[in-house]
Curated annotation (Swiss-Prot):
UniProt KW keywords: Cytoplasm, Glycosyltransferase, Magnesium, Metal-binding, Nucleotide-binding, Purine salvage, Transferase
Segments crossing the lipid bilayer: none
Cofactor field: Mg(2+)
GO terms of biological process kind: GMP salvage; guanine salvage; hypoxanthine metabolic process; IMP salvage; purine ribonucleoside salvage
EC number of this enzyme: 2.4.2.8
CDD domains registered for this protein in UniProt: PRTases_typeI
GO terms for cellular component: cytosol
GO molecular function, one term: hypoxanthine phosphoribosyltransferase activity
InterPro entries in UniProt: HGPRT (IPR050408), Hxn_phspho_trans (IPR005904), PRibTrfase_dom (IPR000836), PRTase-like (IPR029057)
One Pfam family it belongs to: Pribosyltran
Lineage: Bacteria, Bacillati, Bacillota, Bacilli, Lactobacillales
Function: Purine salvage pathway enzyme that catalyzes the transfer of the ribosyl-5-phosphate group from 5-phospho-alpha-D-ribose 1-diphosphate (PRPP) to the N9 position of the 6-oxopurines hypoxanthine and guanine to form the corresponding ribonucleotides IMP (inosine 5'-monophosphate) and GMP (guanosine 5'-monophosphate), with the release of PPi.
UniProt protein name: Hypoxanthine-guanine phosphoribosyltransferase
Length: 183
């Protein structure tokens, strides 16, 4: 049974809604300069990146296109399965394009490393922007080109991040209480 008030499942707020909006504005200004005159393909990684992508592109003041991919290394639970699966490929031709991958979080790095290598192999110039970077969780070597917040190695939900498909709609990023997932 789901709780009626999602906030009750949160141990603490790591990044507030106001901080996310402010950081999205800052990143948008940087990305506007980076991609001025280039018409980048802003590639959201479904499903978690949707809130961040929606907030971020409002602050990028240049022509851009958007598309989406679904790649997963989580199959429920709180730990990565280690296996990266391409579930939905990009519809747009990527050869010769500037691509900005938008991700909600970089944890183990497996998903982003896989995606970056796949798109570069297809002839794209790829950069990565992530709302959250969790370097303590890294298993493979990959660094985002642009990052909103560096966070500790805790299981977080909200602003697109989920636990068993719940909590994505929280307007902030918070640490989920262990009793929620240690049942």
């Amino acid at each position: 049974m789901l709780e009626k008030n999602l906030d009750k499942a949160i141990e603490k707020v790591l990044v507030s809604e106001e901080e996310i909006i402010e950081k999205s504005k800052e990143l948008g200004e940087i990305l506007t300069k980076e991609y001025e005159g280039k018409n980048p393909l802003v590639l959201g990684i479904l499903r978690g990146s949707v809130p961040f992508l929606a907030e971020l592109i409002k602050h990028i003041d240049c022509h851009l296109e958007t598309d989406f991919m679904t790649v997963s290394s989580y199959h429920g639970g709180t730990k990565s399965s280690g296996e990266v699966k391409l579930i939905l490929d990009v519809d747009t031709a990527v050869k010769g394009r500037d691509i900005l991958i938008v991700e909600d979080i970089i944890d183990t790095g497996r998903t982003l490393k896989y995606l970056k290598e796949l798109l570069e192999h297809r002839g794209a110039n790829v950069k990565i922007v992530t709302l959250l970077d969790k370097p303590e969780g890294r298993i493979v070597e990959i660094k985002p080109d642009y990052s909103g917040f560096t966070i500790p190695n805790e299981f977080v939900v909200g602003f697109g991040l989920d636990y068993e498909e719940n909590y994505r709609n929280l307007p902030y990023v918070g640490v989920l209480k262990p009793e929620v997932y240690n049942k």
